[in-house]
């Protein structure tokens, strides 16, 4: 973005412009006679692009309409004769014909200035076509304030063509060239014959460069460089690396499929690498490992399924058609060796296996030298040894409850009770004599968690007696008819409490079994935590203790009797 501070006084610009006289009618002469430059060389650029020139033109605070076309005029007398032609050696001077003097220096653009350029194919209104559109009317540019006619309807300035009918010799063509200025930056040309700069100028908004796409026929630019110039500096790949400029993975559906294009370096400014040198960078596969050049996972749906083809090679990234056929001995070298102690699941499948842990239809055949009577042609090869039971025909069909026993359970043989018949027993889960039986026990109606059964186990009952009897010992009470119905609070006491049989006890005997509270602590019999909102709020134990002492001293004023304390 280009911007200028227009608040600088006009007098400073006028004094500065007189110091920058580099090419004018009064300063034509040898380069040694030109005035010295005030700033270093890098402050004077050697050329501007059309966009930059248009942005500089828009910075002029003109009161009239700003011009877009800059006619070129030659200052000096025109030669009439051949003798005068030889003596006439002027330097062309670029003069901007604008109605107002400009603080922006006149310049020679890089398209038509410093070097003789061929005839441009751009349209005549190239600068209007490339640069930004016309700027709006300047601040205060109104006929009522300036007293001048508005320039909005004025026509464009007439471009004065350069007459070329006069025969120009080769010497004249060399003399009329604009002298080349060897400088990496644009050079400004100031004209000292312009009108005096207006002393009073109003503040103008800063101009902003707008980027436009150039027309056809002109090279596209990125900054001050063309795309053709930028492409000359494309990344050069060294000889030790390959080039994948034209490679493609189109139609490569398998993971890790090698490319069929060999890696080569192709560049205009690099010498082509021989094939033997380029192949040195290819990864070499040692003889102890195979190659998966022709392997495919097509149709391999199971995880970890082995491939049926295994090859080995020396190089990779070669055309498969160039490889010679390998003998079967080499192909079989890298196959997995299966030991004798392990089976094979080559043709196994889990198709249709919906249950977790469901056995396969085809299982590994086990050869047991200790049990030669095993027949491996049986449908189910999962033979279970004699020391454990079998769940071959067991089923959980219809088992909706968690932990529900199966219909078919393991038959237990008890050597201590040979009279027990497994064929006559309804329930095969026979419990030995050291334990009770829960054969007829039921949890029907037990909705509470941890609620005891109606029949409590009694170890003293013989195992033949299948009836469960709830025998309660003397040291504990019974909760047979206890119920938690209506108990909605956590830890709520039951409505059935212990009762002592034998009638009323004396007052002294009742006090013996009560909780004895030491003297340093109070009594919390009737205490309540109502309105206790804060965590850890202490109880009013001290107040209770003082109240009790007062009631002991003044029993006539106590609210309750001392016997009820």
Swiss-Prot record:
- Compositional bias ranges of the Low complexity kind: 1-27
| PANTHER family per record | CALPONIN, PROTEIN UNC-87
Composition skew (Polar residues), residue ranges = 250-262, 384-398
Q: Bias regions of kind Basic and acidic residues — which residues? A: 54-69, 369-381
From the Swiss-Prot or TrEMBL record, state where the protein is found: Cytoplasm, Myofibril, Sarcomere, I band
| UniProt keyword annotations, A-Z | Actin-binding, Cytoplasm, Muscle protein, Repeat
> What is the superkingdom listed in this entry's lineage?
Eukaryota
- Please tell me whether the keyword DNA-binding is annotated for this protein: no
Q: What is this protein called?
A: Protein unc-87
Query: What is one term from the GO cellular component aspect held by the record?
Result: actomyosin, myosin complex part
What is the stated purpose of this protein? Thin filament-associated protein that is implicated in actin bundling and actin filament dynamics. Exhibits F-actin cross-linking activity. Required for the maintenance of sarcomeric actin organization in striated muscles. Competes with unc-60 isoform b for actin binding and protects actin filaments from depolymerization by unc-60, thereby contributing to actin filament stability. Cooperates with myosin to form actomyosin bundles and inhibits actomyosin ATPase activity and actomyosin motility. Might protect the myofilaments from mechanical stress.
Q: Which gene carries the instructions for this protein?
A: unc-87
Free-text comment on this protein's domains from its UniProt entry: Calponin-like repeats 1-3 are required for actin binding and acting bundling activity.
Q: Which GO terms describe its biological process?
A: actin filament bundle assembly; actin filament organization; actomyosin structure organization; myosin filament assembly; negative regulation of muscle filament sliding
Region Disordered: what ranges? 1-83, 237-262, 369-400
UniProt xrefs under PROSITE patterns: CALPONIN_1 (PS01052), CALPONIN_2 (PS51122)
Summarizing the annotation, the consequence of altering residue 207 to V is: In e1459; Disruption of myofilament periodicity and thin filament accumulation at the end of muscle cells
Calponin-like repeat copies, ranges: 237-262, 285-310, 338-363, 384-409, 431-456, 472-497, 517-542
Assembly, in brief, is: Monomer. Interacts with F-actin. Interacts with myosin.
User: Which family does the UniProt entry place this protein in?
Assistant: Belongs to the calponin family.
* Effect of inactivating the gene: Defects in the structure and function of body wall muscle, resulting in variable paralysis. Disorganization of the A- and I-bands of the myofilament lattice and accumulation of thin filaments in body wall muscles in adult animals. More densely aligned myosin filaments indicating higher contractility of the actomyosin network. Excessive contraction of the myoepithelial sheath.
User: What is the annotated tissue distribution of the protein whose record heads this document?
Assistant: Expressed in the body wall muscles. Isoform a: Expression in the pharynx, anal depressor muscle, uterine muscle, vulva and unidentified neurons in the head and the ventral region. Isoform b: Expression in the body wall muscles, spermatheca, vulva and in the myoepithelial sheath.
GO terms of molecular function: actin filament binding; cytoskeletal motor inhibitor activity; myosin binding
Which spans are transmembrane here? none
